[in-house]
Amino acid sequence: MTEQLEARVEDVVQDIARDLDEEIYVLAPPKQNYLLLEVALSAAASLLLQAFVEGTKTVIADASADGIRVGFRRIMHSLRNRFAGALDEPNSMADDDANEARRNIASELWELRKHWTATQLESLTAKVQLDFQQALIGEGMSEGAAVSVATKLGAATTRLLAEADDTSV
């Protein structure tokens, strides 16, 4: 894995963070959602992107409808727990969590790129985007916001996977 890919993940996370809508607040535990104002949106974007990449790995592991449903339920539960954990921490610790998430994203993208063709990954990302969108709606996000967030995450993942390929040369 290269530092170049990790830097690109950081750039993409910042782009996503700039575009996040207020709807992101529904993913925080109800008693803590106001605390998202205190946590950098880049931390939220990092966690969302990591969850999306985990969704891609879930679909690879078990592409059956039940496998995907169970996998996304687990991912959304994990995402809520990570949000709760980040909200319970001082901002510096939340930033550390976000940095770790970005490193994990770069590592996972690198691994995916080593084992799958660009065409396979593009198709897979489109499938995950739809599943992720439904999972966000299931977590209480409005349909419009879920479509917007899932589309941004799908586009970011596709772009990063292409760049992971470019950095491997």
Regions found by a protein language model. Give the residues of each.
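Short amphipathic alpha-helical segments that predominantly mediate membrane engagement
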Residues: 1-42, 69-169
